[in-house]
C-alpha cells in the first residue's frame, strides 16, 4: 500500500465545522481528538502528517496556548506531527502561476479600494445631513464618530476583508503549506479557500479539514484492530438477533 502523506495547515486542527462534525464544543478537546486519530494512523498505517516549520508549527502552538489548551495538546503536536521546513529554493513553480497570482492580487486590491471609497462617500454624505449647532461642536463630533463613523468603519472592515482576503494566499504559512506539499507530493489539509484554490493551480491534492478526520477513521476501520472490532460487533449483533427470534 502506498503510504499517504499530508501537510496540515493550522485550520486542519482548529476548524469549527470539523469540531461540530466530530461532536466537540471545546477547541482543545477537538484538537486532541484529531491528533489522536493522526497518532493511530501513524502507528497502524505509517501515515505521515507534516507541518511546515517554523511558520505553521509556531501558529498552531500559539493558537493552542492562547486558547488555554493544556500541555497535552502541545505535546501531541510535537509528537505526532512531523516538523519540516519547506525547501523554498528547490521546489519549482512555473512563472505562469506567479503571473496569474500577481494579476489576481491586483484585481483584489482594486476591488478593496472600491469598497474603501464607497465607505468614505457614505460617511461624508451622512455627516452632511446631520445638524451641526456651532456651539456644540465637540458634542457633534463625538456623535458623528459614535453614530456614523463607527458603524460604517465596522461594515467597511468586513467588506474589505471579504473583497481582498477571501480566496487569496495572505500569509507566509499558507505559502509554506503549499510548497511543502509540492515538495513531498503530499495532500494539503486545510479549511481555507485561498489554499484550496492555489493547491489546484499547483496540482497539489487538497483535503477539506472537515472531511480529514472521517478519512482517517475510514483507514483505521480496515486496520487489523478495526477488522477485529468489526467482527466482534457483527457477532454480538447476530447473537442479539438470534435471541430475539427465539423469544
Swiss-Prot record:
One of its GO terms (biological process) is tRNA 5'-leader removal. It comes from the Archaea. It holds the Pfam family PIN_5. It is an enzyme of class 3 (hydrolase). The keyword Nuclease applies. One of its GO terms (molecular function) is ribonuclease P activity. Keywords: Endonuclease, Hydrolase, Nuclease, tRNA processing. Its EC number is 3.1.26.5. InterPro entries: RNA_free_RNase_P. Residues 223-247 are annotated as: Disordered. It catalyses: Endonucleolytic cleavage of RNA, removing 5'-extranucleotides from tRNA precursor. PANTHER family: RNA-FREE RIBONUCLEASE P, UPF0278 PROTEIN TK1425. Belongs to the HARP family. RNA-free RNase P that catalyzes the removal of the 5'-leader sequence from pre-tRNA to produce the mature 5'-terminus. This is RNA-free ribonuclease P.
Amino acid at each position: 500500500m502506498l503510504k499517504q502523506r499530508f501537510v496540515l495547515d493550522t485550520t486542519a486542527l482548529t476548524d469549527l465545522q470539523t469540531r461540530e462534525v466530530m461532536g466537540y464544543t471545546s477547541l482543545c478537546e477537538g484538537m486532541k481528538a484529531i491528533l489522536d486519530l493522526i497518532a493511530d494512523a501513524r502507528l497502524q498505517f505509517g501515515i505521515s502528517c507534516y507541518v511546515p516549520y517554523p511558520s505553521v508549527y509556531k501558529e498552531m502552538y500559539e493558537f493552542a496556548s492562547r486558547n488555554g489548551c493544556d500541555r497535552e495538546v502541545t505535546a501531541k503536536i510535537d509528537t505526532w506531527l512531523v516538523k519540516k521546513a519547506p525547501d523554498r529554493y528547490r521546489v519549482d513553480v512555473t512563472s505562469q502561476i506567479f503571473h496569474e497570482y500577481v494579476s489576481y492580487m491586483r484585481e483584489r486590491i482594486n476591488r478593496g479600494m472600491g469598497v474603501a471609497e464607497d465607505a468614505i462617500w457614505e460617511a461624508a454624505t451622512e455627516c452632511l445631513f446631520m445638524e451641526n449647532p456651532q456651539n456644540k461642536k465637540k458634542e457633534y463630533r463625538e456623535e458623528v464618530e459614535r453614530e456614523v463613523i463607527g458603524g460604517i468603519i465596522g461594515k467597511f472592515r468586513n467588506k474589505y476583508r471579504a473583497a481582498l482576503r477571501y480566496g487569496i494566499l495572505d500569509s507566509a504559512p499558507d505559502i509554506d503549506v503549499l510548497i511543502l506539499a509540492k515538495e513531498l507530493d503530499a495532500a494539503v489539509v486545510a479549511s481555507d479557500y485561498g489554499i484550496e484554490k492555489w493547491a489546484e493551480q499547483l496540482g497539489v491534492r487538497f483535503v477539506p479539514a472537515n472531511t480529514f478526520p472521517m478519512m482517517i477513521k475510514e483507514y483505521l476501520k480496515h486496520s487489523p484492530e478495526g477488522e477485529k472490532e468489526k467482527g466482534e460487533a457483527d457477532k454480538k449483533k447476530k447473537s442479539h438477533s438470534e435471541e430475539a427470534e427465539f423469544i
